[in-house]
A protein has these predicted regions:
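Bacterial Sec-dependent N-terminal signal peptides
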Residues: 1-24
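N-terminal accessory beta-strand-rich subdomains and adjacent acidic, glycine-rich linkers
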Residues: 24-248
């Protein structure tokens, strides 16, 4: 019994230290309706609330470099900064000449020359990793995991090319398909999904997952896990050899 008490005590102390080591930051949209809470601890996670209701559960993000360094795991925070942006940007290919760029931003600076920037718009939450180093580096993996609080209904476009269960064969595709609607737990785990896709969070709230500003980086695909209410990011690896294609 004495040993049990000691073990329980040690467990409680360890849990307490883990909780105390975590740091949380909250970022709100300009109108206050959207809120994301970012947690820095053993992992870097964020969630999203809309009008006080959770629409995205705590979801991890990270980036792994070729040298083995992982941005987002057991990261040491060096500082934070925030700003509010309200400006007009030109939009020559849209129905309006200008668009309002209006958001609140939180930057988390970490000790190994990298940052994570979160932005909260009135209609969305965005994030990106930023390197402060002037040296080039290679990214070998990235963790993108969307974990939802319930088994929501999603409308997704599956990749048509390639073999079932063989993601590598599905990366080369035309990005064309009709959308399939089903619950997260019933999505086809053998097929990749491309963006954009939409998850219905209920009460008139739709979550559209997409990306922007890509340069020298593979686009994001998503995959489902059977029986689970989450979507996991998949990235096409850099090809060992390229061959000129054609349609002859």
């Amino acid at each position: 019994m004495k040993k049990l008490k000691i073990l329980l005590f040690l467990c409680v102390v360890a849990c307490t230290l883990t909780v105390q080591a975590q740091k949380q930051f909250t970022l709100n949209s300009p109108d206050g309706k959207l809120q994301t809470t970012i947690t820095v601890g053993d992992k870097l996670t964020y969630d999203i609330h809309c009008d006080g209701r959770q629409i995205l559960a705590s979801s991890p993000i990270s980036m792994t470099l070729e040298n083995g360094e992982v941005w987002g795991e057991k990261a040491k925070l060096a500082g934070t900064s925030g700003k509010k942006v309200d400006q007009m940007i030109p939009s020559p290919f849209y129905r309006a000449n200008e668009l309002r760029d209006y958001y609140n931003e939180l930057t988390l600076r970490f000790k190994k020359d990298w940052n994570v920037e979160f932005r909260a718009y009135n209609d969305g939450i965005a994030y990106r990793f930023v390197s402060r180093s002037k040296k080039p580096f290679n990214v070998v993996d990235e963790t993108v995991d969307y974990r939802f609080p319930s088994d929501m209904v999603a409308s997704v476009p599956y990749v048509k090319a390639g073999k079932d269960g063989d993601y590598e064969s599905q990366y080369f595709n035309s990005f064309e398909n009709t959308y399939t609607t089903d619950r997260l737990s019933k999505l086809n785990k053998k097929r990749l999904m491309f963006l954009p896709l939409v998850v219905d969070a209920g009460e008139g709230v739709k979550i559209c997952i997409t990306e922007s500003g890509l340069e020298n980086y593979p686009g994001l695909y998503l995959s489902a896990a059977e029986g689970e209410k989450r979507l996991t990011g998949q990235f096409a690896p850099y090809p060992k050899k390229t061959v000129q294609g054609g349609h002859n």
